Structure formats: structure tokens, C-alpha cells
A protein has these predicted regions:
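Conserved Radical SAM active-site core
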Residues: 82-100, 104-159
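Flexible, acidic/Gly-rich N-terminal and inter-domain linker regions that tether
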Residues: 1-92
């Protein structure tokens, strides 16, 4: 028996390839993938949307900071920042983390004081967007790596 697919860590093409092993035809697999990311629902029992729970959130003005706790007990912090775009429309930028802690050692940075604890995998990085969109209820317009960690030190997961 095949184990459930954790869709958050897969590209669309990776998911489609693996969904075929579960007997899904390409159109159905595409619908499952779209539903997972657009509506936040798993349409099949063999698909999981496993993500770290949000254990804390803080709102200051229109800015929302939220903390997700991973299976190992370590936490990541993400921030949704509202701003007006060039055309005057409201946008939301999500600052995501690529690591827990950081090895850079910058004296001005609180995260650097922790040292590097571990890299996040692609699923944990995408789970920050998923948490903002489906748990917090604010779909980001832009995403930047300005949370915890140095994205260039975790390129395999970032890309």
C-alpha cells in the first residue's frame, strides 16, 4: 500500500507523476492539486495537507505575525505585511523563513543569536504560505525570504 502524498513539498509535475501511481488520471490529478492550493482541501484520502500548526499570532495594525510549531518542537515565524502597490491597490507581502535559526552570525539579528538549528524542507517553506492563505485567511500577493535563516544556504529547498 502506498503512503499518503504530502502535497505541500511537491512541485505540480512531481505531484502529477506520483498521483498516477495512485490510479488518478491526469485531469483528476490536476483538479486535486488545484483544490489543495486554491481551496486548502484534500479531495482524496491519499493526499495530505500536513503543515505545522499555528501556535501563536500577533496583530499590530494591519501586520500579522504568526508562529508555526514543527514536529520536532522548533518554531518558525512568518509575517504578513500590508502595503499599497504602485496602482494604489492593497497588497500583502509574506515574509517566510528558510531555516530555523541562522549561521550568519550578524550581531544585529536576533535569529543569528540562536545559531543554525536546521534547514527547512520545501514542504515547511510552502506551509508558511499555506498557513497564511488558509489558516490566517490572508492570501499573499508577494513572497520574500526575509524571515529566519539565509535562503542562499538552503537553495535545494528554496528553489
Amino acid at each position: 500500500m502506498l503512503s499518503p502524498l504530502d502535497i505541500l513539498g511537491l512541485t505540480r509535475d512531481e505531484f502529477l507523476d506520483r498521483a498516477l501511481a495512485y490510479g488518478a488520471k491526469r485531469p483528476r490529478a490536476l483538479a486535486i492539486y488545484r483544490a489543495a492550493f486554491r481551496q486548502g482541501v484534500a479531495l482524496e484520502p491519499w493526499v495530505t495537507l500536513r503543515r505545522p500548526p499555528i501556535v501563536n499570532s500577533h496583530v499590530e495594525g494591519d501586520t500579522i505575525k504568526f508562529v508555526q510549531r514543527h514536529d520536532d518542537g522548533l518554531e518558525t515565524e512568518s509575517v504578513l505585511i500590508p502595503m499599497f502597490g504602485r496602482a494604489g491597490q492593497m497588497t500583502r507581502t509574506l515574509c517566510v523563513s528558510s531555516q530555523i535559526g541562522c549561521a550568519m552570525g550578524c550581531r544585529f539579528c536576533e535569529t543569528a543569536q540562536m545559531g543554525l538549528m536546521r534547514n527547512l524542507d520545501a514542504a515547511a517553506i510552502v506551509a508558511q504560505w499555506f498557513g497564511a492563505t488558509h489558516d490566517v485567511g490572508e492570501r499573499p500577493t508577494n513572497i520574500v525570504f526575509m524571515g529566519m535563516g539565509e535562503p542562499m544556504d538552503n537553495l535545494d529547498s528554496v528553489l
